[in-house]
Every structure is written in C-alpha cells, then in structure tokens.
C-alpha cells in the first residue's frame, strides 16, 4: 500500500542520514512501513491520505534510527577499551519521538480504535 521509495526519500530528508548505511536504513524503513500498514484500516484511506501514512512511516523509521544511533554512540568503545558514554542523546530521542507522535496523530482516524494500539507500541 505505501510506496517504499517515497518513504525512503522522506526518511533521508528528515534524518540527515548518510547513504553509507543503505541496508540498515532500508530494513528500518520496511519495518516502519509494515508497522504503519498493519495499524491502518485500508478501507478508510482515501485520496491524499496515503501521503500522510507514508510520512508517518518515515517518522517511525527516523525514531527507530535515532534510538539505534544513540545506543551505538553511547556504547562506543575506545581503542583503550573504555566505554565513552559522555554524550547526552535524550534530546535527539525526544525530538524524534515527538515527530513520530505528531505524524501518527495525523493518521489516527485511519486506524481502528483511533490509534490507541499504536500509541502503546
């Protein structure tokens, strides 16, 4: 239902992710698309609704990407073997969470139950 190329393009525009993580990014985007599609009632989608759904999938992928990157950066091990956990990534995660929340709220009318199930995920 959702167009992979449009979701992927939106992901790159939102995340500033470099193209060197293509396989990982494509997997994140596909997983986000699957999650959004499974939460939607396809019979409720009309006209331009699909673009809002694709944007929500991109925002979901951005949130997942930001969480993974924060985890990697916080747990990076230096050459000497000591962990470098000096970075504060909570602001990035909070911003990505808010972006996802706003995008999902735009399409909650297309979900059975008004989006409650997705909010708990």
Residue ranges and their predicted role:
Residues 34-38, 59, 84-85:
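Short amphipathic alpha-helical patches
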Residues 1-53, 101-121:
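Conserved short "hinge" loops at termini or chain/domain junctions
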